[in-house]
Amino acid sequence: VSDAEGAVTKVAGVSKQDGVKNVFVRGLGDRYNATTFNGFALPSEDPEYKNISLDFFGTDIIQSVGVNKAFNAGGSSDVGGATIDIVSKELIGSGHLGFGISGGLNTQTVAADFLKQDGVNFMGFANRTEPADENSWNFRNKLDPSAQHLQINRSYSISGGKRFYVGKDKNPLSFFLTAGHTTDYQYTDEIIRNTTTSGTVYKDMNGKKYAENISQLALANVDFDMQNRHHISYNLMMIHANTQSVGDYNGKNSIFSDDYEN
């Protein structure tokens, strides 16, 4: 188990389907579930979905994950499947420093040409320079995709923290910070077929889709315990996600005309 998504699939009634974002709870998908972080609702990084991707949350930032499949007064009212609550990690002990690195590749596609869009850097940030003259602009980015010959999935992470003791009562004050970067490549052979209600086929295409997903996550935690009677904790989380894809398809697509061959 390397992230929150893998953790919740170990719970009875929770499953994951390849190619589909997030998990199913008792057969109910994204629109029926809710995701919270330390009890607070989380927005999705993708406007097409209700829930944030659980694979953003690696085990290095998770203290525990809870799955509540029953209605309760403290939960969201629009949940028919489950509420998934992610509890962030706090510093244990006097200090901590850790590094992580991982990689992977698909031996069947590593030697093949992988098509990429132009316009983003290694960190997944795009060129957002606005033209001074809207009537004339020399675009830096090319519409033609570039070919990459070695696709290596990679992930880096760093975490660290320190505990101090404040005042004559030596109340513990701890700081914890973790950050990570992930790059993931996906290649799929696709068949796309659509018909009208009368059964007329208006789209029949075969092709390949190349997708690159780049994301960063940073989490900071400050925790103060006053004489074991009062507890104050503050968490700050930042997520950046960039998804780009290139599709190369051949076949029939007659959405905008009676008979169009692509």
Kindly give the residue locations of the regions a language model identified.
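Short beta-strands and strand-coil junctions in structured, solvent-facing domains, enriched
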Residues: 14, 32, 42-43, 71-75, ...
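Outer-membrane beta-barrel translocator domains and adjoining extracellular loop/strand segments
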Residues: 110-115, 187-194, 245-253, 259
